[in-house]
Curated annotation (Swiss-Prot):
SUPFAM superfamilies: Ribosomal protein S16
Gene Ontology annotations for the cellular component aspect, listed alphabetically: cytoplasm; small ribosomal subunit
PANTHER family: 30S RIBOSOMAL PROTEIN S16, SMALL RIBOSOMAL SUBUNIT PROTEIN BS16M
Keyword field: Ribonucleoprotein, Ribosomal protein
Stated family: Belongs to the bacterial ribosomal protein bS16 family.
Protein name: Small ribosomal subunit protein bS16
Chain ranges passing through the membrane: none
Amino acid sequence: MVTIRLSRGGSKKRPFYQIVVADSRSPRDGRFIERVGFFNPLASGNVERVRINLDRVNHWIGNGASLSDRVASLVKEAQKAA
């Protein structure tokens, strides 16, 4: 099953997440199919907090991909802002 979820990057105590389309059986930070955005939980000031390619997310949802809980809330937030 294909899922859209967060893949952690960044350094220790400074997380940075890529929003990726991946097979649900692959490791969290392992192989992915496509990168569709990023999420920076520590963003402050003028720094961009979240960027999501909503066209690609909708394409994958149409093809049967499921969203993780956190990504679902980020997509909802991005749709409100758009």
